[in-house]
């Protein structure tokens, strides 16, 4: 971009005042910046609370209107939170809560490849003037963009103008989230209490989008799609809790309980095919050809029974132990129970030593197990339905063969750590080291071609992980009217694939061969998440090797690294006045 006078994209618009006019070929550093707008958020809230000797009630309502940073985008959010508790008798109380959120969104920019973000960051041109694009992308009834196919063909080579995407290829979605519970507490005897609680969490999403077609647009077939997604989680929890002081120095807390969980997920989508019968009338029933429909349903159930015992000695030493049974509907029904246990201990040594600067000090260690059940419908053959061929329905056989003998796996983890606080809690350190192994994991492996399937689900994979977690917090400034808190965290995680299946030492997790000749794989003996792909060939001196036709030579199946970060962390700063 040396400032040479050239014809820019808008100099090819017929009838435009700048038709045929040349301008300098120079960079415009603010071209992407000028597309975005200042976001504005308005929030209104109302709270109410009331209580007495035997009841309490609280309600909060909040409305938020958000004008987004991209043009023609808006998001409105409405929240309602209600909670209350009533003592029915001296020994019985009930409680309940409801949390609801409605979120309505218009024309938020999507993410991923093909989105505005991908356009700006990967394919954009720095000489473009965003103000000219906004004013001229729609001119005299036709659409124009910066990457026209040729001097005589104004259709985009790859991208419509960004403002066309925001004002003409519109989308909308509405999300509803509800969660609530109802429970009862009963004092059964001295130190013995009972609790029964039911919980429900539900999420619903509806979305609509249209693909507009006009003169010179990238799309040549108009379309419309809509979908709904419903997810719910229901849980029943019942437990007995016994607490007593065995001696003046030793206290006991014991819990036995039972949980029943149910998860449901339903996805329904529909889109037009072949265009629209009536132009600019965006409903699925206006499809020129038979519309495409898709529905997916997933139901899973889990049950658990557990017991926990905690012992505390002189507020110095604590020991906890638990044992539980878990049943999962996604495993073989004849072998779907997993037994696990957990033992932890902690010692508060700051109670025994007198260090003026030390406010609190604790060391801890523990061992825990947890179940890992397979995904839904891995034990039963399922078939997907497709678009009917005339009056004949169509169904597809899955590529992965179901395994009716599939069971759950187990995670075993050991953890050590300490927690220190100094100077009346003005400075703190929390450190943890963990070492875990996941065994008997359900994994999809390559199946023999003679089976008619490409993959098979089996229980065999073993992975091991270790890492550290460090959190540091402090209050550098503390006065009567001002408080400044700082916190930082740092963590590492190394996950290694130890075993997959006899005769199989790698599994392809994802593939982008069409774009980058790259696979995401797990390989025995390597850290999880290896990127495998082609790499330019080098000679013994590190020079790039070229073929006889002048093109670069490549070697396939080369390791480029893995997707796991060396470390993660963050810093939080909070000021209160």
Please name every model-derived segment:
Residues 526-529, 533-535, 548, 554:
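Long intrinsically disordered, low-complexity, acidic S/T/P-rich regions
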Residues 50-54, 63, 313, 422-424, ...:
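A generic beta-sheet turn/junction motif
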Residues 1-23, 89-126, 130, 135, ...:
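N-terminal, post-signal-peptide soluble/periplasmic segments
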């Amino acid at each position: 971009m040396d400032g040479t006078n050239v014809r820019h994209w808008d100099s090819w618009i017929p009838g435009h005042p700048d038709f045929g006019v040349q301008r300098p070929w120079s960079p415009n550093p603010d071209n992407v910046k000028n597309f975005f707008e200042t976001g504005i958020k308005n929030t209104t809230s109302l709270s109410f609370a009331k209580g007495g000797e035997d009841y309490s009630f609280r309600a909060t309502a909040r409305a938020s209107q958000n004008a987004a940073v991209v043009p023609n985008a808006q998001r409105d959010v409405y929240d309602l939170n209600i909670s209350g508790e009533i003592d029915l008798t001296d020994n019985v109380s009930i409680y309940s809560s409801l949390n609801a959120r409605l979120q309505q969104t218009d024309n938020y920019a999507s993410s991923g490849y093909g989105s505005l973000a991908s356009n700006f960051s990967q394919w954009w041109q720095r000489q473009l003037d965003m103000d000219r694009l906004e004013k001229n992308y729609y001119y005299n009834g036709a659409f124009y963009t910066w990457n026209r196919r040729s001097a005589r063909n104004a259709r985009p080579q790859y991208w419509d103008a960004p403002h066309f995407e925001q004002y003409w290829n519109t989308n909308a979605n509405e999300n509803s989230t509800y969660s609530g519970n109802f429970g009862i507490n009963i004092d059964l005897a001295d130190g013995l209490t009972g609790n029964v609680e039911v919980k429900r969490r539900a999420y619903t999403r509806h979305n609509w989008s249209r693909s507009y077609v006009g003169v010179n647009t990238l799309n040549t077939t108009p379309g419309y799609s809509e979908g709904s997604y419903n997810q719910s989680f229901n849980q029943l929890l019942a437990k007995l809790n016994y607490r007593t002081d065995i001696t003046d120095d030793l206290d006991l807390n014991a819990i036995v309980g039972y949980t029943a969980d149910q998860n449901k997920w339903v996805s329904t989508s529909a889109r037009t095919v072949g265009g629209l019968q009536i132009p600019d009338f965006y409903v699925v029933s206006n499809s020129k050809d038979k519309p495409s429909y898709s529905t997916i349903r997933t139901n899973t159930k889990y049950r658990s029974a557990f017991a926990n015992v905690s012992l505390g000695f002189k507020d110095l030493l604590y020991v906890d132990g638990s044992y539980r049974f878990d049943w999962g509907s996604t495993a073989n029904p004849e072998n779907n129970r997993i037994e696990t246990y957990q033992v932890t201990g902690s010692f508060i040594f700051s109670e025994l030593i007198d260090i003026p600067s030390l406010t609190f000090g604790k060391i801890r260690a523990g061992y825990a197990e947890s179940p890992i059940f397979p995904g839904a419908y891995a034990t039963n053959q399922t078939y997907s339905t497709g678009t009917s061929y005339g009056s004949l329905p169509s169904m597809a056989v899955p590529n992965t063969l179901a395994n009716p003998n599939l069971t759950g796996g187990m995670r075993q983890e050991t953890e050590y750590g300490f927690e220190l606080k100094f100077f009346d809690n003005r400075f703190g350190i929390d450190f943890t080291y963990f070492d875990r192994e996941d065994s008997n994991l359900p994994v999809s492996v390559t199946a023999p071609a003679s089976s008619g399937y490409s993959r098979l689900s089996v229980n065999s994979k073993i992975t091991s992980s270790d890492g550290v977690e460090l959190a540091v917090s402090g209050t550098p400034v503390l006065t009567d009217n001002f408080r400044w808190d700082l916190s930082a965290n740092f963590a590492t995680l190394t996950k290694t694939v130890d075993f997959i299946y006899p005769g199989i030492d790698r599994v392809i997790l994802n593939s982008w061969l069409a774009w980058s000749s790259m696979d995401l794989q797990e390989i025995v003996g390597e850290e999880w998440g290896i990127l495998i792909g082609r790499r330019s060939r080098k000679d013994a001196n590190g020079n790039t090797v070229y073929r006889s036709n002048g093109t670069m030579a490549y070697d396939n199946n080369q390791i480029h690294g893995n997707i796991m970060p060396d470390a993660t962390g963050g810093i939080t700063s909070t000021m209160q006045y």
